[in-house]
């Protein structure tokens, strides 16, 4: 019995020893974590973010950019967003992109619906070109929709502090594909529009190659969009608000070279168009051709300016790439140097105005196209001839409204509509036509314009 008591006491003593030993190890581990945390906090000064460098290669694949100091990678990464702009400036860029991108998206969507078979009954090179360009604009502007509800102070676009979006992120990949495909498809069809405008002014009639135009531009856009995925090229850059082609080489091959070719070709057509317009003004009193084409001419010119600005801004960034890389390295070296005070470290900066205009140009394309292709008598005529304004429900509503207006204006001081049963074209319902015409101060002029030759 005595031996049994001793055995029980030994078990208790052993348990207490083990418990004390485990508590001691836990205390040492806690102190070690505190020391490591304190060390990492001291090491990653300023806006640098701590990240253990032991798994650097895998971390770089998911968007972390590690800092080098004295030729060695450190456990610190570049902050996201980058220090090239302040947080306040980044938020201004983001707010502008959300507002202008949304307006541009719905502008492009209106044109897409208007010129599509959903509304438009007849098609030619011009309407197909506008429809395809609008489709590209809508896709490109969709990339901004991913940023709704985000900013750089509370719910950041960056997945985590110091982490940039990369191909491994589904949101990044999808928005990058939309932006790339929409951009390529949009400016290819914009180039075809300049060609179509030149052919129209010259009065040249060619065979119907619409199917080849659409198929060719679509295939090119598909190739230039999905080939970069093979090497995981869609990512967020130091100066971007979202994902696009990450490598400068891929940007050059799969976007800027093609864009420069389109710019050269379209510029030639624009010069030829201006020449023809000058001849029309100088030698002919007929203003029909000039009046019908001046609106799309301005649209193409403004769009060309936007593309040219984006192209030359990109070239300037590439040319000065070594400079920006050097100032960023100098900034991180200063932060990593324990002998220097943080106040001595000068943050790398880029031109806020130039970046703002660059981000704005792409988002103006849909708005510009809407102004010059969506606000004219041609669009009104398309909608008036469409099913949406020629069905039993609308006719009943318009007829009732027209009858009420006739009754309230029976003194004859104002005529809201005229019945025309002899119109060979049979283009519009009278009640619907009068409802639109009453918005104009001159009904005769409006009706005449609706039955005139289609504008481009």
Swiss-Prot record:
Q: Name one GO cellular component term.
A: membrane
Which positions does UniProt annotate with glycan attachment?
Answer: 34, 52, 70, 151
The record's annotation in Gene3D superfamilies points to: Rhodopsin 7-helix transmembrane proteins (1.20.1070.10)
Indicate the transmembrane segments per the record. Answer: 93-113, 128-148, 175-195, 212-232, 253-273, 298-318, 355-375
Q: Hey, which stretches end up on the Cytoplasmic side?
A: 114-127, 196-211, 274-297, 376-456
Membrane side Extracellular: residue ranges? 31-92, 149-174, 233-252, 319-354
State its location(s).
Answer: Membrane
Arranged from A to Z, the UniProt key words for this protein are:
Glycoprotein, Membrane, Receptor, Signal, Transmembrane, Transmembrane helix
InterPro entries assigned: GPCR_Fz/Smo-like (IPR050949)
Give the domain of life: Eukaryota
Kindly give the membrane topology term recorded for this protein.
Multi-pass membrane protein
**Signal peptide location:** 1-30
List every stretch annotated Disordered. 403-422
Q: Which family does it belong to?
A: Belongs to the G-protein coupled receptor Fz/Smo family.
Q: What protein am I looking at? A: Frizzled/smoothened-like sans CRD protein F
Q: Which organism is it from?
A: Dictyostelium discoideum (Social amoeba)
